[in-house]
């Protein structure tokens, strides 16, 4: 068996065209979605990622700005900048690029974002709504994973899904989204004993721990769907996933590559959530 490759680049491209059409329809009514990103410091990876978001937003007709603050910026000044964006009626969505410098509390900053502009879906109010099945902003990587599965017409009902990783960014929210689709979900983590026992029985595997080569061909049953969220750079700067891609694709039914799988969908869902935020505050269905 040769796995179906879930090409996140192409799926994201198609999805963004639909978003572009919706942005144009909004503009015809006099509204243009605006995404504001706060970046504190000069971390190279963060700068690259923020620039990718800005470019992607502008490509579909949105306005995007990067509020770049110095590495030494105090927590109070970051919160003041956030307050300004919360109150700015031209801003549809806000996200704060993490990690933040040590002097700035990530939790305090994320809790200070207006929940109606929280396009990353990390505000406690939005996380809470997700867990009681209310409409809310969903974290972008889990949402992107679900769109990949949906695009590939993968039926999740009654399937055994294993999620490796329990972070609030990916592992826990994607587990909740899989539950909403009536999958039976098991979460594995660093204290799990005999991880392979769970993997071998899984119909769906989502790995999001940043450990290259964690999942091998021997761990995966034939026909399983394998989603790789890992993106760890090796000594040459090449991104490696958690899955041994070349060997696992020989047995999997479908698999995401790294890079080019989940990553493009994450940025696309930032745009999706920004569009939703603009529609919600304008009372547009």
Curated annotation (Swiss-Prot):
GO biological process: L-histidine biosynthetic process; methionine biosynthetic process; purine nucleotide biosynthetic process; tetrahydrofolate interconversion
PROSITE patterns: THF_DHG_CYH_2 (PS00767)
Gene assigned in the entry: folD
Catalytic activity: (6R)-5,10-methylene-5,6,7,8-tetrahydrofolate + NADP(+) = (6R)-5,10-methenyltetrahydrofolate + NADPH; (6R)-5,10-methenyltetrahydrofolate + H2O = (6R)-10-formyltetrahydrofolate + H(+)
UniProt record similarity statement: Belongs to the tetrahydrofolate dehydrogenase/cyclohydrolase family.
Keywords attached to this entry: Amino-acid biosynthesis, Histidine biosynthesis, Hydrolase, Methionine biosynthesis, Multifunctional enzyme, NADP, One-carbon metabolism, Oxidoreductase, Purine biosynthesis
Protein name: Bifunctional protein FolD
Positions contributing to NADP(+) binding: 165-167, 190
Pathway info: One-carbon metabolism; tetrahydrofolate interconversion
Assembly and binders: Homodimer.
């Amino acid at each position: 068996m040769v796995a179906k490759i879930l090409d996140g680049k192409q799926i994201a491209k198609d999805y963004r065209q639909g978003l572009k059409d919706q942005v144009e329809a909004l503009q015809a009514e006099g509204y243009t979605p605006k995404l504001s990103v706060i970046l504190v410091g000069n971390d190279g990876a963060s700068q690259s990622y923020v620039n990718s978001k800005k470019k992607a937003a502008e490509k579909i007709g949105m306005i995007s700005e990067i509020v770049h603050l110095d590495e030494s910026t105090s927590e109070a000044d970051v919160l003041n900048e956030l307050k300004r964006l919360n109150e700015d009626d031209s801003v549809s969505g806000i996200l704060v690029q993490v990690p933040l410098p040590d002097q700035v509390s990530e939790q305090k900053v994320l809790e200070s974002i207006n929940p109606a502009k929280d396009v990353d879906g990390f505000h406690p109010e939005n996380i809470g709504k997700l867990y009681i099945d209310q409409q809310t902003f969903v974290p972008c990587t889990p949402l992107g994973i679900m769109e990949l599965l949906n695009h590939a017409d993968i039926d999740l009902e009654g399937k055994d899904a294993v999620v490796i990783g329990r972070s609030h960014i990916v592992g826990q929210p994607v587990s909740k989204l899989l539950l909403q689709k009536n999958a039976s979900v098991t979460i594995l983590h660093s204290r799990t004993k005999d991880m392979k026992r769970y993997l071998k029985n899984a119909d769906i595997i989502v790995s999001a721990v940043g450990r290259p080569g964690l999942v091998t061909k021997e761990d995966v049953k034939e026909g399983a769907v394998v989603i790789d969220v890992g993106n760890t750079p090796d000594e040459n700067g090449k991104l490696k996933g958690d899955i041994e891609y070349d060997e696992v694709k020989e047995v999997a039914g479908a698999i995401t590559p790294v890079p080019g799988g989940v990553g493009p969908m994450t940025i696309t869902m930032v745009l999706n959530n920004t569009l939703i935020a603009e529609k919600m505050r304008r009372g547009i269905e």
